[in-house]
Amino acid sequence: AIRVMGELIEKYGYGDWGECLTIADPKEVWHFEVFGEGPDKIGGVWAAIRIPDDHVGVSANIPRISKVDPKDTDNCMASANVFEVAKRMGFWDGKKPFRFWEAYGGGNYSGEMKSFSIREFFILNKLAPSLRLSYDAEELPISVKPDRQVSVTDVMALLSETYEGTEYDMTQNLKVAVKKKDSNETDTVISPVANPWMTRDMVNMLNGLKPDAVKSYRLVAVPQCSYSTVIQLRDWLPNAVGGVVWMAYDNPGQSPRIPIFCGTKDLPACFKVCGQHRYREDAAVWAFRRANKLATVRWGATKDRMKASIAHFTEKGQTELPFVESRYKEILTQQGEEAAKEYLTGYTADFAGATMLRWREMGDSFWTQFERGF
């Protein structure tokens, strides 16, 4: 697949911003990064690294690949021009060690010349604290071996991270005094209107009132996300049920994940309607986005309910998965492949419908909760 992608890039060109793509099958995972070759060239420059077995790799929209060794074909692939383009465009002098991210990247989200940002650092450090990784470093490994085995629900949790309760929590200084119920005593708590997805205008206003009240960090779960996926590949099962895409619309920190199997033949009609440009009740994304945005009005009063709903569907998906796998194989044996895939299609549709109903009900409830003012 990677070589075909490379051939297509060479033939037709790549004209977008730099991009990272993950190429995976049940046996291995490759990390593929690509850039354009310049305004006057049809082509592109790319490199791909195999993530070692038992490792977790992290990329969050900045180049991460460092050493490129085309001779190590078991673990590395690259376009034939990977070094030549860097020299021609003045990105690399050909003398110091070549680092792909340094040659072709423009720094991280903070403008620092690093091979990582806060998101990569946070996840890698959380998975392998024994490595004692430092944010002050110039480069972090593209992958680490976690200190303990990582489950699919661990990955879901990492994609929903807002750094709550850590030193990177953007709400940690937004505290108010609250009188305890049935007591004259007061307690200091995070303001219920504080949330990790505050707009730039809100952050600027708060910092104008009190300097450094909010220190902004790029979150793993960003509110402008259209959708996110956790892809689970199991080689001991038939491909149709062994491959599962756990998809979440909108903010990964606020939405449930819906199982879409490789054997799922079709999706609900609302999944086929784009809701990115305007509000549309017939677009699936708005079944979630409306409640998610309303919840941030008083996140302190809504987050427990929303997190409980996410946990409900996470548990439902994981608890029912073994039954779905077993039932698929049973139908496959008794009725054939088409009937088995129809079963998976129906399961995905039913699961999606249940999540959308829950989020629509929450959205209605939040409107009622805030009807007299936000």
What do the PLM-derived regions correspond to, one by one?
Residues 2-16, 23-28, 35-39, 51-53:
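Active-site-adjacent structural elements in enzyme catalytic domains
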Residues 34-35, 61:
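Surface loops and adjacent helix of pleckstrin homology
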Residues 41-47:
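The feature captures the catalytic groove of carbohydrate-active enzymes
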Residues 6, 17-19, 26-29, 44, ...:
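C-terminus-biased signal that marks the final domain/tail of proteins
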